[in-house]
């Protein structure tokens, strides 16, 4: 889980680099969708977001898309929800 060495996870790295997000939105899992979290930063680069998906189902959220410069960018990120 992400409680182990949180600084080494994707969310830990983003938190250390950018600080606490302005807003966090959580989507719980459903029968046809994995859980995911969006972190929004209103004051960085005119507003950026980071989308993390629990692709394994074990609470390990991975960064799959961001519109921030020099971060993972994948416009088709929603495929990871399946």
Where would I find each of the regions flagged by the language model?
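Residues within mature, well-folded domains
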Residues: 1-82
């Amino acid at each position: 889980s992400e409680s182990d060495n949180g600084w080494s996870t994707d969310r830990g790295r983003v938190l250390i680099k950018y600080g606490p997000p302005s807003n966090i939105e959580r989507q719980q899992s459903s029968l046809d969708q994995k859980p995911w979290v969006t972190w929004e930063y209103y004051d960085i680069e005119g507003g950026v977001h980071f989308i993390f998906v629990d692709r394994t189902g074990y609470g390990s959220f991975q960064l799959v898309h961001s519109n921030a410069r020099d971060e993972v960018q994948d416009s088709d990120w929603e495929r990871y929800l399946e």
